[in-house]
Amino acid sequence: MTTRLEPLSPAKASLMTRLMWRYTKRRFGEVPEPFAVYAHHPGLMLAGAVHEGMLDRASGALPASVRQLAVYRTARTVGCSWCVDFGSMLMRMDGLDLDRLQQIDAYATSPHFSDDERAAIAYADAITTDPHAVTDEQVADLRKRFGDKGVMELTYQIGVENMRARMNTALGITEQGFSSGDACRVPWAT
């Protein structure tokens, strides 16, 4: 599938956009396709990049596996193949066990997930369901596990992934090969 908005070519991109692409290519091996599509609105692309950087730096209240599994589950539930692909690569880069992702549909009973991870994945499901199905009891349990700061971080991360996944899906952005190491779909990058 091709994207609904053509990725912006470097010839049409501003200097700032090309610098951002250079940074992401060095960091991830390829320019993430959403960046090439979002570049049609450089101001929003820059705002998103700054937000992502700040979000990454600010997120430390939760164990990485708890946060990343909840985000992965959200992307998968929404159906964003690009988010699943990129998220899998990030988890691999962080040294997390990717084999567990094959068990995520059975998280409630699978021995591959801790109780904290199960609670976070269930919360991601409850938030991502439309209408959401979050309960007072669920949040009370999460507060005991992670504290108020951890619940806020988990809620924010799941909410942001809902936004990312829904934007990418709406724009027709699909997997790019990051999880396989074969990232090459941006047309002008080959």
Kindly give the residue locations of the regions a language model identified.
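Hydrophobic alpha-helical segments
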Residues: 1-190
